[in-house]
UniProtKB/Swiss-Prot annotation:
Cited CDD domains: TyrRS_core
UniProt entry tagged with the keyword Cytoplasm: yes
Presence of keyword ATP-binding: yes
Protein name: Tyrosine--tRNA ligase
């Protein structure tokens, strides 16, 4: 596989942004060690926006010959008040539920979970020189920049927060350098931390990423955030500015169960959630069901996706590209209910191996039902 083919795998859906493609090409060309990482807070159940979007990209990175790592951010979750802010509970959930759920998600998206290294944050944070790296980074970042970066925790600028939360962005940047990560991966909502990492990379004294004497900047790969299924707070959306603002607010959320499908959901739960989903006829600009079709079903094109309909409504129709389906929907040739039903059946089939695993091994879900899920 040549360099351009490897770059195309990194750029493949659901990737929305690579900072920068030129730097990625440079890392391939000089033969730098390619170490990927994606970090997760440990909170509630894993939904498709976490499991499938991250799992899909991990599969792509593996195909491109990049070492993959999932970072279980227990301390970060504690700082951000997840699972009642109980560090021991967070660690138990990380190892007994989250790790297993991500392994299964990676597998259904075509990756090899056995080739993914899972690292608990506390394994490295308890080493003294980690904090040296945090301070080194902090000396190169202004307080106002840190304040603007708290949105990576799902917090609003201006929100009353405890001081520990100001340390969080610097820890997230330190995680990259301390682990020798050359490819930092996350959803688009983590962009601010990754931009800081790129900007400070060549200023660091402790744990810079060095290859043959060259201080390297990490590459940041940001995947699409799946939209939640709920109706936006304002509809219709009139201006482009409103559209961007609402789209950023309406990502899938585990705290809004009907906005999300979870990886262990039963067939009936999936059908029910899709049936209630916001999916206005002919609306292709803001439509969560179409969003899922584009980034889950048509991640690879061409692919065959069949919508089953009674003969009196036109009979079955098979699409091979997202644009074909989108055009039919915009023209009113594809009814929202038919699309919802087809997406539900696709997801039921895709998630079947995960569902079967948790039916045979109920302990992780029993653990989740016993803990206090906050935020």
């Amino acid at each position: 596989m040549d360099i351009e083919e490897r770059i195309n795998l990194v750029l493949k859906k659901p990737t929305e942004e690579v900072l920068t493609v030129e730097n990625l090409r440079h890392l391939f060309e000089i033969g730098a060690p390619l170490q990927h990482y994606i970090g997760f807070e440990i909170s509630g159940y894993i939904h498709l926006g976490t499991g499938l979007m991250a799992g899909a990209k991990i599969a792509d990175f593996q195909k491109a010959g990049i070492k993959t790592r999932v970072f279980l951010a227990d301390w970060h979750s504690w700082i951000n008040d997840k699972l009642g802010g109980d560090l021991e509970v967070i660690q138990e959930v990380a190892l007994k539920y989250f790790k297993v759920g991500m392994e299964k998600s990676i597998e259904v998206m075509g990756g090899d979970p056995k080739k993914v290294e899972f690292v608990l944050a506390s394994e490295i944070l308890e080493k003294g020189d980690y904090w040296q790296t945090v301070i080194d980074i902090s000396k190169n970042v202004t307080l106002s920049r840190v304040m603007r970066s708290i949105t990576i925790m799902g917090r609003q600028m201006g929100e009353a927060i405890d001081f520990a939360k100001l340390i969080y962005p610097m820890m997230q940047v330190a995680d990259i350098f301390y682990q020798g990560v050359t490819i930092a991966h996350a959803g688009m909502d983590q962009r601010k931390a990754h931009v800081i990492a790129i900007e400070v990379a060549q200023k660091l004294r402790y744990h810079p990423i060095v290859h043959e004497g060259e201080k390297l900047k990490p590459v940041a790969v940001h995947h699409h955030l799946l939209l939640g299924l709920q109706e936006p707070p304002k509809w219709p959306i009139e201006s482009e500015e409103e559209f961007k603002e609402i789209k950023a607010q309406m990502k899938m959320s585990k705290s809004k169960p009907y906005s999300a499908v979870f990886i262990h959901d039963s067939p009936e739960e999936i059908r029910q959630k899709l049936r209630k989903a916001f999916c206005p006829a002919r609306e292709v600009r803001y439509n969560p069901v179409l969003d899922w079709v584009e980034y889950i079903i048509f991640r690879e094109e061409p692919t065959e996706f069949t919508v089953h309909r009674p003969a009196k409504f036109g009979g079955d129709v098979t699409y091979t590209t997202f644009e074909e389906l989108k055009r039919d929907f915009a023209e009113g040739k594809l009814h929202p209910l038919d699309l919802k039903n087809a997406v539900a059946e696709y997801l039921i089939n895709l998630l079947e191996p995960i569902r079967r695993y948790f039916e045979k091994h109920p302990e992780p879900l029993e653990l989740m039902r016993s803990v206090k899920i906050t935020r």
